[in-house]
């Protein structure tokens, strides 16, 4: 089967500031209707990369194709950008801000749709400087959608938000993706990447060091999930299971690609599961395996 044409294709992207290589030989393909996450610690090159993709900065070298053609000046008219740092005018209300952007870039008939999509209804008469961090981000997301973009850029969309606001924003972004929009985001949150992204490109020191779906990367670099049982379990019963297990110093570890099926198999053997725990790897563990450092270094 022929691979579908990517909506955005980047080859050998490089950005140098005097003696500093901020982006080093980055190549990416982003397919329509998917979410790609650039994941990495501060200073990894994520923001510089996305700003080049947004056409804010020119690359030192490399090519960028949009819908199969070299990126042109009209590119900005077809994309939406939610910046990491808000630049809202304090004295305007949410309604005034959204109306202004729609007047400049959008369709007045889209106002109600954007208000509903980004859950802004109760905030319309509130001034921008009275909004919480999560409310500001929802307004910024609505502004990024004003021109009905086919491609949306989100730079650290949930940084600084409390857990509930972060989860609410993710649900809105996930719904936007479900409507067929293509999303590229930067994040240093492995939870955000696992929740939103179909593909992630893990960056470190300006380079992509791993790329793929979160599930595939976790399996490739960290192996299976594991069920942990106390040493009191009768290991003779485990001999009949088609799973790799090992007795460690203070526990028994059973590796499995399907945790729920394994638990069901243990139950049929009348193994006491009251002391069971589950160890699951995540993208933080992948980054640690690749670099020896934590994502939040």
Cite the ranges covered by each PLM segment:
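Short, charged/small-residue-rich alpha-helical element at the C-terminal edge
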Residues: 223-297
């Amino acid at each position: 089967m022929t691979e579908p044409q990517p909506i955005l294709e980047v080859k050998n992207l490089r950005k140098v500031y005097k003696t500093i290589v901020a982006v080093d030989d980055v190549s990416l393909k982003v397919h329509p209707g998917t979410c790609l996450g650039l994941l990495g610690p501060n200073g990894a090159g994520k923001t510089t990369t996305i700003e080049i993709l947004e056409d804010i900065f020119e690359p030192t070298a490399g090519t960028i194709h949009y819908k199969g053609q070299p990126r042109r000046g009209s590119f900005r008219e077809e994309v939406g950008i939610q910046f990491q740092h808000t630049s809202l005018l304090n004295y305007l209300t949410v309604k005034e801000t959204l109306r202004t952007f729609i007047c400049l870039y959008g369709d007045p008939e889209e106002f109600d749709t954007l208000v509903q999509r980004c859950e802004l209804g109760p905030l319309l008469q509130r001034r921008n400087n009275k909004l919480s961090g999560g409310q500001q981000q929802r307004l910024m997301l609505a502004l990024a959608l004003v021109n009905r973009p086919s491609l949306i850029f989100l730079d650290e969309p949930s940084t600084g938000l409390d857990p509930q606001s972060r989860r609410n924003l993710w649900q809105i972004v996930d719904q936007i993706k479900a409507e067929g929009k293509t999303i590229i985001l930067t994040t240093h949150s492995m939870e955000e990447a696992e929740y939103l992204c179909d593909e992630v490109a893990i960056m470190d020191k300006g380079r992509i060091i791993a790329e793929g779906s979160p599930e595939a990367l976790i399996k490739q670099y960290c192996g299976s999930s594991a069920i942990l049982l106390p040493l009191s379990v009768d290991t003779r019963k485990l001999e009949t299971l088609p799973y790799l297990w090992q007795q460690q110093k203070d526990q028994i570890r059973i590796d499995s690609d399907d945790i729920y099926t394994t638990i069901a198999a243990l139950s049929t053997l009348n193994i006491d599961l009251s002391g069971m725990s589950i160890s699951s790897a995540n993208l933080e563990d992948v980054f640690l395996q690749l670099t020896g450092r934590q994502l939040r270094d």
